[in-house]
Amino acid sequence: MSSVSASWLDEVKWDDKGLVTAIAQDAASGRVLMVAWMNRESLQLTADTGIAHYWSRSRRKLWKKGEESGHLQTVRELRLDCDGDVIVMQIEQIGGIACHTGRESCFYRRFENGGWTTVDAVLKDPRAIYHP
């Protein structure tokens, strides 16, 4: 998935903090697994390595998805939306867990009967993932 020239990065509409929204979608099922942020460096690293890299706004640092948990995201395809301000990545989620809560997806709550209902089970206790 290597990029030949970095000029393609100029087509992305970065926000005032130099970030763009990035959606990770399971390549096989189409399910949205997570939404995060990318800066130029993380998007370039993602294109060059084929492994999803993000920018952590809370930690203010580059973040290779799965660097602590082992739940890497292998990128199959990168797409830029019509406005140039959202990236969608078709990914293979190694280990089947994308969410830090130990679930397949960060979108595990569904709006039902006027409130949020948890509809996806925890696949692995986060304490076992991050503090074995």
Curated annotation (Swiss-Prot):
It is an enzyme of class 3 (hydrolase). InterPro entries: PRA-CH, PRib_AMP_CycHydrolase_dom, PRib_AMP_CycHydrolase_sf. It catalyses: 1-(5-phospho-beta-D-ribosyl)-5'-AMP + H2O = 1-(5-phospho-beta-D-ribosyl)-5-[(5-phospho-beta-D-ribosylamino)methylideneamino]imidazole-4-carboxamide. Its EC number is 3.5.4.19. Keywords: Amino-acid biosynthesis, Cytoplasm, Histidine biosynthesis, Hydrolase, Magnesium, Metal-binding, Zinc. Pfam families: PRA-CH (PF01502). One of its GO terms (biological process) is L-histidine biosynthetic process. Homodimer. Catalyzes the hydrolysis of the adenine ring of phosphoribosyl-AMP. HAMAP family: HisI. This is Phosphoribosyl-AMP cyclohydrolase. It comes from Chromobacterium violaceum (strain ATCC 12472 / DSM 30191 / JCM 1249 / CCUG 213 / NBRC 12614 / NCIMB 9131 / NCTC 9757 / MK). The gene is hisI.
